Amino acid sequence: MKYSYFQLTFGQDEAYLDPEKSYDRLIRYGYDAIELTPPKGRYGKGVSIEQFVETNKRLATAYQLDISCLNDCWGEAWDPHSPKYKTLTEYKTAQKAIRETKETIDMAHELGSEFVTVAVAIFEDISEKNVRDAVDVAVSSLQDMCDYAAKKDVSLVFEATNHLEMGKFVNTMANHKRLIERTGKKNLGIQIDWFHAGFEELNCFEAIYEAQPLLWHMHFRDTNSLTPRYGNTDFKAVMRALVRFNYSGYCTIESSPMYPDIEMAVGDGITYLKMCEKIARLQLRPEYPNGYAL
């Protein structure tokens, strides 16, 4: 596995005004990559997109950290431009989503990042009466984004989000996969966030199974939105499933809030997940549990 951290959870002052702190911290704890949020709307502390790209390109080279993904924020609660936020279910706000995502795709291309996150934010409640129209807007919008991303050698990862934050529409791996298949695009995959999955999925294994073969990226935070191990997600089962399906993408850790503090959350997260990965690989060997293979 490759391990990354979602930088925005360190706070905006660090992420935009003193980002070298993030790079130094992640190298000290053995991370492979950093996940960034572009400076847009209420995010950025006045840093321009040009400054953001130049600074992170320099730091990524200096610290030999990959940039695992660029993650725009979606949904009314998190979108940088709330309340006039982007969605994937209504034409005008979907056009905004397309413009914003293309801008982020350009940044990802400059920074050498393979992925940009997209999510389903809804414009109004979805019901049996309007679901077909919403799906049509989402599919058309995703196709437009994917066509642009393909020209930049960037892929999009579609994050499955819980219904309390994004509304009842496309909340499960199975429904994300259905929507992706409707687009017909090869550069659109799935991003699991284990906090959201805890609301929507039957269990960890079935979530990973349903996402195949489109599981390209993941966010690791626990059921209480804290660092892995601080809640009750069965991350050993998660790791066994990932090993079984030969997952080779990033495991991006996040914690919101940074409990009990940044250093402990960052250190405990990667230490615990690496232990879970090690145990998973041991449990799947033919010698387990007797010490010899039959």
Give names to the regions the model predicted.
Residues 249-256:
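Conserved active-site loop/cleft motifs that coordinate metal ions or position small ligands
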Residues 33-34, 39-40, 70, 133-240, ...:
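Acidic/histidine-rich catalytic cores of soluble enzymes
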Residues 31, 113, 215, 247-248:
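A structural motif
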Residues 108-128, 157-162:
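Active-site groove signature of glycoside hydrolases
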Residues 4, 68, 116-117, 157, ...:
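Structural detector of well-ordered beta-strand residues that form the stable sheet scaffold
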Residues 78-85, 117-126, 252:
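A short small-residue
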Residues 1-113, 132-133, 143, 150, ...:
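N-terminal pre-domain/capping segments
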Residues 10-18, 37-52, 78, 124-126, ...:
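Acidic-and-aromatic substrate-binding clefts and catalytic sites of carbohydrate-active enzymes
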